């Protein structure tokens, strides 16, 4: 199956659609690449879309995130630990951990920092921080867009108000516009 076999709307609104269930999970299930640029990133987003990430990792997929440096202290530590330990862990360990069908979503929420660390350790996730040059010190990188690619080379691009956090995915009123390459 490829993206072209999925039902993809041209717009998702969080008060109408379940963006995680209706957009992220089906697309990540088919994806081999997920590139995201956001103003704010939180490991809570990984917990929300962990099933899709697991599917993508099983496809040999990779995630690349560019975000502003406004991260929680916990996420900074998890990211640092992930990069420090990247070479010492085997990819199958993280796949086994997040593939367990008997594990509840509460586990993912509780283990979000461990998930962030493991995805980085295993080379599945890379995070880069974007800084802006400004005169007053008040500007920040705040773009919000994403690209996902499947094994057939089909691309789904999206942009809108949504950051990469559980709050954006589950609580806020957010809109994304979606564009398909086919």
Stretches with model-predicted labels:
Residues 1-182:
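PLD/PLD-like phosphodiesterase catalytic module centered on the HKD motif
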